[in-house]
């Protein structure tokens, strides 16, 4: 994989001014983003998140998932901490793309869970890859991470590329009546480490 750094700009947000670093995968044409806040110390653990694109949750306020809640909470946590990063990866629908995600939602509306819907469309439950994160983290100067995630695959991916995950920080927010079954499936079938007692209900 060939990841090329492109440019950096300021990104004012409700939680403060982040820096937005643009990257291009020259093999696939996909464009990824790293957000950084404050001064990142390469010798100390940095609070961060690897976030896969979710148009419906991040931008359209969907209650079918917890993605938008996780992104906003991660940005708020980073701002309150004073420094940190988010890698925003263009892997919509756990890697199957937006239109296939809508097809999967249609199957879920008919009774399939999130894993079954992917499989009925001929896809694995999770097609995401994380090999692009190494050059992105190298560019922003991060070697040791306090990773905000419930997904053990992300912890494993970081360790495999030589990034030390000092701590896994749970990010359990956004549970509501529309996504309760989805979150349960992520826990029971995809191995996400979640406890219903830590969710913040959003009705």
UniProtKB/Swiss-Prot annotation:
Enzyme Commission code: 3.5.4.25
Gene3D superfamilies xref list: GTP cyclohydrolase II
Cofactor: how bound: Binds 1 zinc ion per subunit.
Binding residue positions for Zn(2+): 54, 65, 67
Highest taxon above the source species: Bacteria
CDD domains: GTP_cyclohydro2 (cd00641)
Alphabetized UniProt keyword annotations: GTP-binding, Hydrolase, Metal-binding, Nucleotide-binding, Riboflavin biosynthesis, Zinc
GO molecular function per UniProt: GTP binding; GTP cyclohydrolase II activity; zinc ion binding
EC top class named in words: hydrolase
Cellular compartments per GO CC: cytosol
Biological or metabolic pathway of the protein: Cofactor biosynthesis; riboflavin biosynthesis; 5-amino-6-(D-ribitylamino)uracil from GTP: step 1/4
Chain positions recorded as GTP binding sites: 49-53, 70, 92-94, 114, 149, 154
BP term (GO), one: riboflavin biosynthetic process
Protein family according to the UniProt entry: Belongs to the GTP cyclohydrolase II family.
Role noted for this protein: Catalyzes the conversion of GTP to 2,5-diamino-6-ribosylamino-4(3H)-pyrimidinone 5'-phosphate (DARP), formate and pyrophosphate.
PANTHER family referenced in this protein's UniProt entry, alphabetically: 3,4-DIHYDROXY-2-BUTANONE 4-PHOSPHATE SYNTHASE, GTP CYCLOHYDROLASE II-RELATED
Protein known as: GTP cyclohydrolase-2
Organism: Shewanella sp. (strain MR-7)
């Amino acid at each position: 994989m060939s990841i090329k750094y492109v440019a950096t700009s300021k990104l004012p947000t409700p939680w403060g001014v982040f820096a937005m670093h643009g990257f291009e995968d020259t093999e696939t044409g996909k464009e990824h983003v790293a957000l950084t806040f404050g001064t990142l110390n390469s010798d100390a653990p940095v609070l961060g998140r690897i976030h896969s694109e979710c148009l419906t949750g991040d931008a359209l306020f969907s209650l079918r998932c917890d993605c938008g809640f996780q992104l906003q909470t991660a940005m708020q946590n980073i701002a309150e901490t004073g420094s940190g990063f988010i890698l925003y990866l263009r892997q919509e629908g756990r890697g199957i793309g937006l239109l296939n995600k809508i097809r999967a939602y249609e199957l879920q509306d008919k009774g399939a869970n999130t894993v079954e819907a992917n499989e009925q469309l001929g896809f694995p439950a999770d097609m995401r890859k994380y090999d692009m994160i190494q050059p992105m983290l190298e560019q922003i100067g991060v070697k040791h991470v306090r990773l905000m995630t419930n997904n053990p695959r992300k912890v494993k991916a970081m360790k495999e590329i030589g990034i030390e995950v000092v701590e896994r920080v749970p990010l359990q927010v956004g549970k509501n009546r529309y996504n309760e079954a989805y979150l349960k499936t992520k826990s029971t079938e995809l191995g996400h480490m979640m406890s219903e007692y830590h969710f913040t209900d959003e009705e």
